[in-house]
Amino acid sequence: MRMLMAGLLMMASLFVNAQDEYPKPSKESLDYNVYRTKVSVPPYGLAKVKAMIAKLTPNDEEIEKLPDNLYNSLSLREKFTYNMIHGEIYSQNCDPMPPVEDEHKKIFAQLPGAFDEYSWSDKQTQFFDNNRDSVIALIKESVTRSKRVGVNYKEAIVSMNAVEIIPFLEEVYLRDKKDHDILTVFLLLMKANKYQPFLASSSFKKLYGDDANYGTHIVYNSANEQLILQRVNDFYKNYKR
């Protein structure tokens, strides 16, 4: 028992020391983290959908799934709301992510997760694929109204491989150039479609090479921004669905 307690105390000490070694981001960096991890909440049947979600309890596999009869009773727009605010599958990340310094000065290789330790089920991603045109239209409608693209919308766009939304996203990005994760969406779309000029670039090797990880990034500056926009526009012009 004493050995167990000593081991636990040592682990706790190591954890505290590791926390002390974490960087201490600026307020601007922390504010940007809040901005980039914000989920867009659609208004369609929102109160009804939230009430349904509030009654869910995880099953033995930690899945919080709306029963099929209730899910099928929802309209398309209500299903859109449900899927955009609720991930059904539990996927715990055991490794805590340390704070990121100067997060607002980076273009990341990957998007942050929309639902913490949960993610979309196959049923939910299938909804996006089966109703692709409607989902894209609803995302555009919501973004036009709110003037922002939530991380859940970005994840859905990448999941659907929605290349056709590139011009719209670029227009949104150029309004204030604040949301650098829109540039990440462009990178992920080019990667998913194996766009050779991008795959052959040094930035691709840096972002998605053998040494890449969840936090891999390139510096946000005018040169990198313009290069991504130029490449994604060339990709879009030559894309054949």
Residue ranges of predicted features:
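Extended repeat-based scaffolds of very large eukaryotic assembly and lipid-transport proteins
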Residues: Q19-N152, K191-R241
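Core of folded catalytic or high-affinity ligand/protein-binding domains
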Residues: R148-S159, V163-I165
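Bacterial Sec-dependent N-terminal signal peptides
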Residues: M1-E28
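Short amphipathic alpha-helical surface patches that serve as generic macromolecular interface elements
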Residues: I166, L183-F186
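Hydrophobic core positions within HEAT/HEAT-like alpha-solenoid repeats
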Residues: K154, F186-L187
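Alpha-solenoid HEAT/Armadillo-like helical repeat scaffolds in large eukaryotic proteins
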Residues: L138-S142, A156, F168-D176
